[in-house]
Amino acid sequence: REEFFITTKIWIDNYGYEKCKASVEESLKKLKTDYIDLVLLHQPFSDYYGAYRALEELYEEGKIRAIGVSNFYPDRLADMCLFGRKVVPAVNQVETNPLNQQVKAQENMEKYGVHIEAWAPFGEGKNNMFSNPTLVEIGKKYNKSAAQVILRWLIQRGVIIACKSIHKERMEENFKVFDFELSNEDMEAIKALDTSDSLFFNHQEPSMVEWFDKMVYERRDK
């Protein structure tokens, strides 16, 4: 078991103290394990306070080894780290890629001892990410793909990476990023690509909160 690092997320449907506890217990049964390494709260909406209290208790019981959050923007992250919180989030998983680099967000997380974790490090290929001239040219210097350049860039920034693939060859490629190092010039060139705009959606928009609320209630009605 110790050779695997297992992460799971709590969806909004299971927020609130009792529901969150029940959700983790169900995950433990399904995974057939005594503990989960990291449990994340998926969104900063609904009763995430109650859910977080449940995770703190499960942490103290040894059933989870670390608590994390996802998509928590700076003010909500600060709220989760202050006010006598028993356990500070270990990570905050946010969209992070060359076009949305989250530099200020990372600085804010470091202030509270929270590690940044990137979801959508490749932006799901949006905006021609894999054929971006800057990334492709840097890759040619090291005989690496644009995807490998992105992963290496994140590693050198101290960003934890959550990337996935269903293709074995791409999984293998994703591991081959420890045999080269980007120069300062390379890092600056990638830094210049930042637009600070999401390739997906803005969690601070009221319309986005309304969308999540509608989705949760539609799921309950099924």
Kindly label every feature range from the protein language model.
Residues 2-14, 37-44, 71, 95:
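A short, structured active-site edge motif that brings together acidic residues
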Residues 3, 33-36, 64, 89:
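Local beta-strand N-terminus motif with an aromatic residue
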Residues 14-15, 34, 99, 146:
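Hydrophobic alpha-helical elements and their junctions with loops/disorder across both membrane
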Residues 16-31, 50, 77, 101:
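Short, acidic/polar
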Residues 20-40, 57-61, 83:
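CE4/NodB-like, metal-dependent polysaccharide N-deacetylase domain
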Residues 43-222:
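Beta/alpha (TIM)-barrel catalytic core signal, keyed to glycine-rich beta->alpha loops juxtaposed to Asp/Glu
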